[in-house]
């Protein structure tokens, strides 16, 4: 649905309005999907080794969404006690695939190009 929407948004004959004003057609150059919990094969990995602490701090900013032994809300994937450990372990496992400490995986429907073979880890 996201890829179709991005394609359609670039068609001149598709007319849309926002706040009663016509929108100009525009299409993003690329669409990348972050791999969350599905065991998907990434199309590429990004080294996040220097940013894991920042990522965890950002996640913890939403602490009401996560495990709280005093909470009576229904359990979700992110409210499980081991959620943060899962995040750390997943990034470490993906990092292992490219020889770094931590990585995040992404998928895309397009072919990715690089300038130099040496840029590939």
Go through each PLM region and give its residues.
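Metal-dependent de-N-acetylase/amidase catalytic core
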Residues: 1-121
